[in-house]
Amino acid sequence: MQKMILENLLTPKKYNHKIRIGPKSDGGYVVSKNHLGKRLISLGCENATKFEEEYLSINQEAEVVIYDGTSSCDLASKDSRVSFHNKNVYSLSELTIDKPCMMQIDIEGSELFLLNEQLDQLKNVEQLVMEIHFHKEKYPAFPVHGSFQEWVNLFKLLNGMFSLIHIHVNDNGIVQKRPKFFGMYDLLELTYIKKDDTLEVEDRHFPLENLDYPNAFGMNPSIGWWTKQTKLLMSEK
């Protein structure tokens, strides 16, 4: 039952205007080319900024704001469009989100802690790209990973504001032999755009050719196998 609930909440919508930004490995993401905004807010970088660099190369009038309390950021000293804050963000209220923007979150297991609140602060976010970690035994300093119900509540909140258009398995979790979370791979990369109720349910499995690539170890497992079933169930309502 829990597995089916997660599948329903993580059912991508069909969207054909996707591109890959960043390397064809860890650190690259599949995003909507129509929801880039004029500002990218990146939470977590570990001084690996290929994603941010390519974002600026295709969106040259934009700016990038990076937060990371655990690393430096060489890109900020090379490009005046980039500002860096050497701090970790623990609440969305710490961010200035005052105009349409894109947000990228890779904070190694604290995403539930950050987003487990009212999401009104995200009303100006056109696109949200995030890596989620269901289990966090690798990062004991962070708050304990959330319960099943906490994740369900978060996905419901996100689905109320956004449409999920892409899902990718980060194979680092497979190699590290992390347990699945009620049937879901431990590390998932999710791409959301501003809510669009006209989008239909995706009927393809992921990965998608020429967009999805293994993160590090040559694995690219299939995901999204439940979409046809979800589409059928929705049509019967």
Locations of regions flagged by a protein language model:
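Rossmann-like AdoMet/SAM-dependent catalytic core
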Residues: 1-34, 39-41, 48, 54, ...
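Short, conserved loop/helix-junction motifs that constitute active-site signature segments
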Residues: 34-36, 55-59, 79, 119-125
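A structural micro-motif
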Residues: 38, 62, 82, 125-126, ...
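Active-site flanking residues adjacent to catalytic metal/cofactor-binding acidic residues
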Residues: 43, 67, 103-105, 130-132
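Short, polar loop motifs at secondary-structure junctions
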Residues: 47-48, 66-75
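S-adenosyl-L-methionine
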Residues: 72-110
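Distinct, well-ordered alpha-helical segments
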Residues: 96, 111-120
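Conserved beta-strand signature within the Rossmann-like core of class I S-adenosyl-L-methionine
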Residues: 122-137
